[in-house]
Amino acid sequence: MISLITGASSGIGKDMAFEFADRGYDLILVARSLDRLKEVKNEIIKKYGKCNVEIMKCDVSNVESVKNLYNDIQKEFGNIDVLVNNAGFGDCGKFYETDLEKDISMINTNILGLHVLTKLFLQDMVKVNKGYILNIASIAGFMPGPLMATYYSTKAYVVRLTRAIAKELKVVNSKVRIAAFCPGPVNTDFDKNANVTFSLKGQSSSDVAKIGVNGLFKSNKVVYFSSILIRIVACLAKIMPESFMANQAYMTQKRKLR
C-alpha cells in the first residue's frame, strides 16, 4: 500500500506521514525542500524501521512540475492507494495591499496543484475501482474571509470540488473515496507564513493529523472537521447570513494581524 502526501516536510503533512507509516503504508513524500524531506524520512525510518519512504521534490504551484511528478510516480511505482493533497499556504492583509505574486502562487498551490493531482490520480483509481483521496481544506472554506480573502476563497474551492467529485463517484457506485478534511487553527508554521497569530487556541498538528487520517478510513462523510467546535462553526456558516459571517471573520482576522 502506497500513500502520497504533498506538503510533507512539516506540519500536518509531516504528521500524517507518521500516521500512514503507523498503519503500514509505504510513503511517497513530496515538498519543495529535499533537505527537510530527508529529515522527515530519517525520523520515520528511525521510528518504524522497515517502512519504505521515498522523497520527491515538486513545486505543486507549477503545473508542469506536477505533471512530471505524476509521470515519475507512475513509471516507478504504478498506482498509488492514497493521495493526500496537503500542500498549501495563506497570507493575511487587505486584498488591495497584499502582494499579487504571492496571491497567484497561493491560488496555484492551493487550487491548481490540488486540482491537477486529483484529476490525474483519480483517473487511475477509477479504472481499478479503489483508492482514497484526502484534500486538506479548512473551516475557512465555509465563509467569506476579509483580510484573508484569497486563502478563504481557495479553501472554498477545495470543499466544493471535493463534494462534486464525491457525488460523481457515488452515482456510479465507485469504491473510490474522496473527502475534504477541514481543520480550524493548528499549531504549525502556517501562522508564520501567513503573518498572523491565531486568536483561538490551535490544536496540535499531530492530533489533527490523526483525526484526519482516521476520518478518511472510518467515516463515510465527504466533508469532516477536526473538532466539534469547528463543526459547529461550519453549521453556523450555513444558516447565518454571509454578511454576518464576513463581519465575524473580519473581526477575527483583525485581531490576528501582528
Predicted segment positions?
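The beta1-alpha1 cofactor-binding region of Rossmann-like NAD(H)/NADP(H)-dependent oxidoreductases
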Residues: 34, 56-68, 100
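Substrate-binding pocket helix/loop in short-chain dehydrogenase/reductase
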Residues: 94-96, 102-107
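Active-site helix of classical SDR
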Residues: 118, 154
